[in-house]
């Protein structure tokens, strides 16, 4: 994980990169131990053991490896800890998946309000990511609330909402059971061509 970099024990992030079976796609895995940054990062900063402000450590890590990649995707937990603040400060574009469901929509509203309040106290060094909303769990079934929720979300966030949506499907979960991605599923393992395409 990036924990040793976050704690000032490594100078670059290349040690954490792991190849995958797909050419050109590498990952840096994470685990629960990475949550140590929530309790230890500020202490390391106070001791003078970090090369940058605590909220800029992920940006610094990415800068050490960015020359090897065209695109870097970061997945973050939906909380407001120092890890998420690092993601916000490291991202050029921040895509926030928001299910087309009422409770998820209200949670996203609260998340953005809290994030805005929190970032008022953080020096972003003149950088602010482009924030976009991605509608997920979208259903076209009769009686679905998704079309109505899409209208509410687009009214609230306007051009921040991406045009495309992620449709609700069981194909991803079925692939996980078989330890395969949706791209690796055999044709006879798919519910239907349409459901597979939605995945």
Stretches found by the model and what they are:
Residues 1-199:
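P-loop NTP-binding core
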């Amino acid at each position: 994980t990036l924990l040793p970099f976050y704690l000032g024990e490594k100078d670059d992030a290349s040690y954490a990169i792991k190849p995958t079976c797909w050419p050109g796609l590498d990952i840096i895995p994470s685990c629960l131990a990475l949550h140590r940054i929530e309790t230890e990062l500020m202490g390391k900063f106070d001791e003078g053991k970090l090369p940058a402000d605590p909220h800029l450590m992920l940006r610094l890590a990415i800068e050490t490896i960015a020359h090897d990649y065209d695109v870097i995707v970061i997945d973050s937990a939906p909380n407001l800890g120092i890890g998420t603040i690092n993601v916000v400060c490291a991202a050029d574009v921040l895509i926030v998946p928001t299910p087309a469901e009422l409770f998820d929509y209200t949670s996203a509203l609260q998340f953005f309000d809290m994030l805005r309040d929190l970032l008022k106290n953080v020096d972003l060094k003149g950088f602010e990511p482009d924030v976009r909303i991605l509608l997920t769990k979208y259903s076209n079934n009769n009686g679905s609330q998704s079309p109505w929720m899409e209208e509410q979300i687009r009214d609230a966030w306007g051009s921040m909402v991406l045009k495309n949506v992620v449709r609700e499907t069981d194909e991803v979960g079925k692939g996980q059971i078989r330890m395969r991605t949706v791209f690796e599923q055999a044709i006879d393992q798919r519910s239907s061509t349409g459901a597979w395409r939605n995945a």
